[in-house]
Amino acid sequence: METMCEVKVITGTSAAAEAAKLADVDVIAAYPITPQTTCVEKLAEFVANGELDAEYIKVESEHSAMSACIGAAATGARTFTATASQGLALMHEMLFIASGMRLPIVMMVANRALSAPINIWNDHQDSIAERDSGWIQIYVEDNQETLDSIIQAYKIAENEDVLLPVMVCLDGFILTHTVEPVTIPKAERVREFLGVYEPKHAYLDPDRPITQGPVGVPDCYMETRKQIEEAMERAKKVIRDVNEEFAEWFKRKYGNGLVEAYNLDNADTVLVAMGSVCGTIKYVIDELKKEGKNVGLLRIRAFRPFPKEDVKELLKDANNIAVLDKNISLGFNKGALGIEMASILKNKKVCNYIVGLGGRDIKIDDIKTIINHVEKAEDDSTLWVGLKE
């Protein structure tokens, strides 16, 4: 069990860089974009100082960054990159190739709004737009979870029952540029926890030639999609197991790995959300509890694979369900999380709240407004919270 560690007061991007170093990655592909730039800068510093023995590839675009990771991962290397917003959008083509080739790349996404208008602040539109790309998506609440989740991501992605890439998503500026105390485990402990990555399907060996990424003709393409879907389903158990194993090694865990339940016992009103806003929600819940009001939170940690079974079980007794979305499905007037929740909880009142787009502050009073609205609403509805009149 872990007995020695170091505590540093660092930003979310530094926590991500520390995690990549602890994972002893072989290849880093780097292209700067706000607000993730300080992550790849910190990794460049680690490599230059000899703290990390990795190939650091400076590329000309995010499309090239993912292409480099794909090429490296196809040789059997453990790879890492980071991006945000328009950079993630530029990667779109290559994201599908990474998952289709079953390459366990790990990427930190510093969630940032998409242009236009140009906006460097936080919402979830960038990663949510890639939810169907075959990548596992984990959304973190704080900087400690950022470090821990990136370490966990390699254990999940490299599992032979999964072999899919993972995005670890943290809120831009709210986490990326905010300092918090983060416990840094010993490198040798992390490397023992992760083990050596020895892929059987992706390698470069002249004595064992293989073909990777060939043409998928109609006779086989559909089966490859089904295989990815089956791997996503298997990933649910792997995510749970890795979360438990991580807790045994490092004394920290995050719900059951897929979701975190907070004050759900006997809660008739439950808020559902992802990311750093959950910290604000927990504060409001604690304050309301002092007043005798019982409200719960279901934090969705893994948006892909989506934890349908957990949602159904944990919300079976709730009658007022408020889903907060930092994204909007334009033309449907709901966020992606709200759409998912409504499709699962067909016989319950599920109201959707669009919040925090482009970095708009989500205040304590906004959370209270949401609670009051969902309790009075007669049926499903969508409300934009904090919108200027």
Curated annotation (Swiss-Prot):
Signal peptide: none annotated. GO terms for molecular function: pyruvate synthase activity. Pfam families: PFOR_II, POR_N. Keywords: Oxidoreductase. InterPro entries: PFOR_II (IPR033412), Pyruvate:ferred/Flavod_OxRd (IPR050722), Pyruvate_synthase_PorA (IPR053390), Pyrv_Fd/Flavodoxin_OxRdtase_N (IPR002880), THDP-binding (IPR029061), Transketo_C/PFOR_II (IPR009014). The keyword Oxidoreductase applies. This is Pyruvate synthase subunit PorA. SUPFAM superfamilies: Thiamin diphosphate-binding fold (THDP-binding), TK C-terminal domain-like. Its EC number is 1.2.7.1. Heterotetramer of one alpha, one beta, one delta and one gamma chain. GO terms for biological process: response to oxidative stress. It catalyses: 2 oxidized [2Fe-2S]-[ferredoxin] + pyruvate + CoA = 2 reduced [2Fe-2S]-[ferredoxin] + acetyl-CoA + CO2 + H(+). It comes from the Archaea.
